[in-house]
């Protein structure tokens, strides 16, 4: 499933002819859930479309009695209730042995949450005709979180048994500039001058962790898993400052 929420505010003020300012804010939040971490990979065993196209129809989706054809429940008894059917991912079939994309689609979980926040504000002064002093500030912050659970029964998670990995990133960019512009007309001649100064900063934070050996089913938090399989983090930063000008 997929959910998206967004909002925006744009406000400008002109209290006098020599002063104006404004504010522009925006926020977007998206939440999406997928069956498995590799469902978007066309060559993955857990890709449901690939699995259906390459799996021979002689292999059943659910366990059944080989003589009567009746579907079986978890106790090996015949049942006609679809809610009691169990997937047939055990055994020694020649095609995709040990995998069942349909079961993995139901058992696995993948949640993606992304929040994008943007803001821009400015201030312009016009002390004399033709002269403008402007300051601009912009900020953009993107928070991204991914949580992937792989079940202990079938698929990649059986090695855990059961495993959970989470990734979190934050990208923050900021820009602050100051501009001086002056325009003047003398007879048939027009003059335009621009002087500017700008600061830019970028920061990216990354955190990833994976734990294996699930304790209790249905609880998708690190505290429910025993062994730390992977844990890493890093931060990238970049800053620059510039001056520029133009004369026309």
Q: Language model features by range: what are they?
A:
Residues 12-116, 134-242:
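Surface-exposed loop/interface segments of Gram-negative outer-membrane beta-barrel transport/assembly proteins
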